[in-house]
Swiss-Prot record:
One of its GO terms (cellular component) is cytosol. It is an enzyme of class 2 (transferase). Keywords: ATP-binding, cAMP, Kinase, Nucleotide-binding, Serine/threonine-protein kinase, Transferase. Its EC number is 2.7.11.11. The active site is at 186 (proton acceptor). One of its GO terms (molecular function) is protein serine kinase activity. Transmembrane segments: none annotated. This is cAMP-dependent protein kinase, catalytic subunit-like. ATP binds at residues 69-77, 92. InterPro entries: Kinase-like_dom_sf (IPR011009), Prot_kinase_dom (IPR000719), Protein_kinase_ATP_BS (IPR017441), Ser/Thr_kinase_AS (IPR008271). SMART domains: S_TKc. Belongs to the protein kinase superfamily. Ser/Thr protein kinase family. cAMP subfamily. It comes from Caenorhabditis briggsae. Pfam families: Pkinase.
Length: 385
């Protein structure tokens, strides 16, 4: 739940709302975390940072709520710790009155329903839901690496091989959710988290929707909206492939291809489709981005007869072993002395020093009020929560 880039939606219909050349470790807050002894301790404990959750049911009373790690228009995400097992979770807290006032009731129900059926290595897990008299709670996997947006902002842009690594994991995730008839509709760096090992975790499924055919309302972030969404001619999974094209471009350039000072100017830029690439942009990547940003969705790569396979078969991904990608096998060669030693490590490994480390998240003011009180009528909208 990032406030870095705003998402938009139409209020007319509430139903919407493995190759890498180098390895880097980022501390996105640029904090000094201690001396060499601390670094050595981090090295030793790196593989022990997450306690795998084993509880099939949760009670809020069993969770110690520690600190806010994300904030949105009608809710926040907090780090929480199970007092019994010691496991850490991300606790999404949604104020019922704010959800209703923002006409997000159906979105919230959609997110819960979608997340509970998703089980994939590149998608954040949801374990349980709870509610009290004023708030809804979603108990989710804590992904300690923070947002991809933070790393992209710190480095300004990613190399061709880094962008390909992350894009390949996103392709696998999109293939999976599309196979279930689900459209994501909010792909952007702020919604992509990094696991402690450095793999992608897609988060925030508030705009996700199960689709049989098309939906017609505008959902998503202005920079990432597809032309058919703006034209209200109906959209489907093609909007996710369009967004992937925007994301690849932004990863490699540092900013999205269609820009403007206002939302209206961004929309005009998308409709005019003046797509320009820096000279340094990899040619194979350029070809893929052009095919993903095809205005005619029937001719857009990923949307034709062969679906995702066309994307996987594109020449930009020719060095990707898709089975290795899906099973988190990443081989890179690191120069140690005079030898190139194969190691298994994503291009960015988050800086972490202990279980529950929140150093890769921004600081937020804590909310001690619990949000505005809600009425019984508003509570009844979530009677089955």
């Amino acid at each position: 739940m990032s406030s870095s880039t705003s998402s938009v939606e139409s209020v007319e219909d509430e139903s919407c709302s493995n190759e890498c050349s180098a390895s880097f470790t980022f501390d996105t807050n640029n904090n000094s975390r201690g001396d060499q002894q601390v670094d050595e301790l981090a090295e030793e404990t790196h593989m022990k940072l997450s306690i795998t959750p084993t509880r099939e049911s949760f009670s809020l009373s069993q969770l110690e709520r520690i600190v806010t790690i994300g904030k949105g228009t009608f809710g926040r995400v907090e780090l929480a710790r199970d007092k019994i097992s010691g496991a850490h979770y991300a606790l999404k807290v949604l104020n019922i009155r704010r959800v209703v006032d923002m006409r997000q009731t159906q979105h919230v129900h959609n997110e819960k329903r979608v997340l509970l059926q998703l089980k994939h290595p590149f998608i954040v897990k949801m374990y349980a839901s709870e509610k009290d008299s004023n708030n809804l709670y979603m108990i989710m996997e804590f992904v300690p690496g923070g947002e991809m947006f933070s790393y992209l902002r710190a480095s300004r842009s990613f190399s061709n091989s880094m962008a390909r690594f992350y894009a390949s994991e996103i392709v696998c995730a999109l293939e999976y959710i599309h196979s279930l008839g689900i459209v994501y509709r909010d792909l952007k760096p702020e919604n992509l988290m990094l696991s402690k090992e450095g793999h992608i975790k897609m988060a925030d499924f508030g705009f996700a929707k199960e689709l049989r055919d098309r939906t017609y309302t505008i959902c998503g972030t202005p920079d990432y909206l597809a032309p058919e969404s703006l034209a209200r001619t109906g959209h489907n999974k093609g909007v996710d492939w369009w967004a992937l094209g925007i994301l690849i471009y932004e990863m490699m350039v540092g900013k999205p291809p269609f820009r403007g000072k206002t939302t209206a100017e961004i929309y005009d830029s998308i409709i005019e489709h003046k797509l320009k690439f820096p000279r340094s942009f990899n040619l194979a990547a350029k070809d893929l981005v052009k095919k993903l940003l095809e205005v005619d969705r029937t001719q857009r790569i990923g949307c034709m007869k062969n679906g995702t396979q066309d994307v996987k078969d594109h020449k930009w991904f020719e060095k990707v072993n898709w089975d290795d990608t899906l099973h988190l096998r990443v081989e890179v060669k690191k120069l140690i002395g005079i030898f190139l030693i194969p190691i298994f490590q994503p291009p960015i490994v988050p800086t972490l020093y202990h279980p529950g480390d929140t150093g890769n998240f921004d600081d937020y003011e804590e909310d001690t009020t619990g949000g505005p009180l809600c009425s019984q009528r508003e509570r009844d909208l979530f009677a089955e929560w």
